[in-house]
Amino acid sequence: DDEGVDSVLLLGEGSRGLCAGADVRALRQAVLDGRDFGEFFDLEYGLDLLIKEYPKPYEARQHGITMGGGLGISAHGSRRLASADAAFAMPETIIGFTPDVGVTWYLAHAPGWTGMHVALTGATVGARDGVLLGLADEADEAAPAGELEDNRSWIDACYCFPDPSDVIAALESHADSRARAAAALIRARSPLSVAVTLEAMRRVPTMTGVADVLAQDRVLADHMIGSPDFIEGVRAQLVDKDRTPRWSHDRIEDVTRAEVEAC
């Protein structure tokens, strides 16, 4: 409502990138200490919705690392410009969480099942694939070619199933080695996170907008952040950095439908 503000320009500080996301180590410690973490998500998701609904121009310059919460504060802008070195990702399944900050709205509406591939694997993509996924409007002309479109044949054939076990089976049995490599990535992620993410992504097309997606994200955050997988995933990736998490389930096939629906 400030008449002195005509528009907003979001820039990252430093050369590494716009934003690598939330301080999940601090969130993990809050859980371990028994402290409330709800206010953090209320503020973060509230900001994401404010950006999406902001009535004035909001331009985000997405350079370098633009992941997790970094996408939350940039992908919802009215103009998103990806630099040649932009690196987009929602890597939450790697740490026992789920893609949030409303970004699954874009991933679920991306061509074919490309968004599902990125959500389940946590894969990093460049500027042109960011445009394909709906995370950016324009890519710098110097940006390298994207890869997702060239992978559409096996992505669309394998990620179309509603059961994560069927997705994995399709990837592992596909003739294309890139499909089998994607299966290996998913096998290394939290099985519970993968199953919950797949279900959440499939619900998005029934929603009316980002506000609905953020409401779903808020419910999932309460369930997932207190789970053993989040505690263990952050430990393995960011605390001890041994990269050998011991998930609550050995395999995706071990996650029950009841466990997914409980989230």
Predicted regions and their residues:
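A structural preference for short, pocket-lining loop segments at secondary-structure junctions
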Residues: 1-32, 46, 50-62, 83-86
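Hydrophobic/aromatic residues within transmembrane alpha-helices
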Residues: 10, 23, 73-74, 130, ...
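Hydrophobic residues in alpha-helical segments
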Residues: 28-31, 119, 159, 186, ...
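Conserved catalytic cores of soluble enzyme domains
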Residues: 37-41, 45-62, 66-77, 81-152
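Positions in alpha-helical segments
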Residues: 105, 180-181, 219
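Amphipathic alpha-helical blocks and their helix-capping loop/short-beta junctions
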Residues: 138-189
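Long, low-complexity C-terminal extensions of enzymes
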Residues: 171-177, 186, 191-263
